[in-house]
Amino acid sequence: MQKDALNNVHITDEQVLMTPEQLKAAFPLSLQQEAQIADSRKTISDIIAGRDPRLLVVCGPCSIHDPETALEYARRFKALAAEVSDSLYLVMRVYFEKPRTTVGWKGLINDPHMDGSFDVEAGLQIARKLLLELVNMGLPLATEALDPNSPQYLGDLFSWSAIGARTTESQTHREMASGLSMPVGFKNGTDGSLATAINAMRAAAQPHRFVGINQAGQVALLQTQGNPDGHVILRGGKAPNYSPADVAQCEKEMEQAGLRPSLMVDCSHGNSNKDYRRQPAVAESVVAQIKDGNRSIIGCLLYTSDAADDR
């Protein structure tokens, strides 16, 4: 690493990581698994477009910190998914990266041993191995697209992705979303702004050119065709925004932007005032609105973990 008066002044070290194609060669998908993931992505796309009448439910722990616990959760999740499959399409939330307002543990990929060692290469390997086991169980998987390089390593294993409230306004993440090979939900801003998510959805639907990495780990100019499967996620802000009036306002703003209203409700975060025990009340409101004839709500997000796990 070159370090002098002008270069890398605030960088203390660098480590070259394995490339995406090396990781995939070590932990490959089978043809059957590829077909399964493609099918689940199509199902979610059909739900977003209104071609499938079921409700999309993305559910799981706030973040993954222990693979064995995640597998035990997945076994229960699979049984529930089969039980409700006529009316609900359950997708397991498997988040490895945690956005932080200031500092804190950034997730299993960044610090898999949770000891400040930041063994990212081990984190990528642990994450891909776990995802393959979950896919092998027949589960569709969801994540938050946070680091722009992570999708090259793990994106082929996911069926749905979210762009979080802190990153929805980021041009980098809008460009990345335009190239993701799966449906993407955009959360409203932390202040509750709908325009942030709606503008992100519009931007991601368009073609983009941006600098990223390819499967060989080379820096490359990537060109996208745009992602047609975007939708808004209402996650609350300074106040909850899941009421019928809030949903109607979102529908209105999406229509004014030339978009077909399609939205999910995040039952946590600002909509539950960050109290996990309030999630059922939010979900009940979503169900009531759908029973009353709402057709723009395509799903909801639920968070399940060990009580008030706030990692």
Locate the predicted segments by residue.
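Acidic (Asp/Glu)-rich catalytic clusters
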Residues: 49, 82, 134-136, 255-258
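Metallocofactor- and cofactor-centric catalytic cores in central/energy metabolism, strongly enriched
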Residues: 37, 41, 64-65, 70, ...
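Glycine-rich anion/phosphate-binding loops
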Residues: 65-81, 118-126
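Active-site-facing alpha/beta catalytic cores
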Residues: 2-8, 87-242, 246-247, 270, ...
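Thiamine diphosphate
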Residues: 296-302
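Conserved, mostly hydrophobic/aromatic
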Residues: 60, 265
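Conserved small/polar residues in nucleotide/adenosyl-binding loops
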Residues: 303-310
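N- or domain-start disorder-to-order transition segments that initiate the globular core
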Residues: 14-48
